[in-house]
Amino acid sequence: DYSAGLKTVMNLSENDNLEISYGFDQYDKARYVNDERTHDHDYTNRQNTVRALYSHIFGKNTLTVGADFLNDYLTTYQFEDNESKNQNSCDAFAQFDYNPLQWLNIVASLRHDYFSASSQHATTGRLALMTKWKGFSIRANYAGGFRAPTLKEMYMNFDMADMQMIYGNPDLKPEKSNNYNLALEHTGRVKNAGFFTGQYSLTLMGY
């Protein structure tokens, strides 16, 4: 297994920050019998990842934009004819952390994903709100989700310990989801209760 990475963080100004990173990971597997490689269990998975993240602070608010790129290469005896597969996925996103009042915080974000092994693209969003007032807090959140299938899920065909065969599905589509969450929390103190004093917290959550 080989892995390496590079990362740079640049403070462009008092309110501007840029972060760029690169990651490399390669996992190789082979089988040897009597010190000779059989080539019937060769496996190589190689991933290259690039990420850029920029943030700008103005007042109590923060704007963050970024992008990711992943190149995934896999060759394995569990593919038909020991062939290799390759795919690219990338995304771009923006997030705004807004604090208009001392007791109110709003976070809104938008993200677009591209997946080379499918004609489907996806744009997902997130909106979160939190407010606090006299020991009470309310949190409301919506988030859209996206997950692209892996090369293993699409193309691997292998025998599971002679019990069953597992077949990949090359027509597998990306997963999409919508998540909603609402929570009410109350914190307080117990005073002058005889032998008992302390703090308490009550949370009611739905999703």
Go through each PLM region and give its residues.
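Outer-membrane beta-barrel signature, preferentially recognizing the C-terminal barrel domain
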Residues: 1-3, 7-11, 118, 132-133, ...
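Face-selective signature of the C-terminal outer-membrane beta-barrel domain
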Residues: 2-121, 128-132, 198-205
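A broad, low-specificity signal for short, low-complexity segments enriched in glycine/proline
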Residues: 89, 143-144
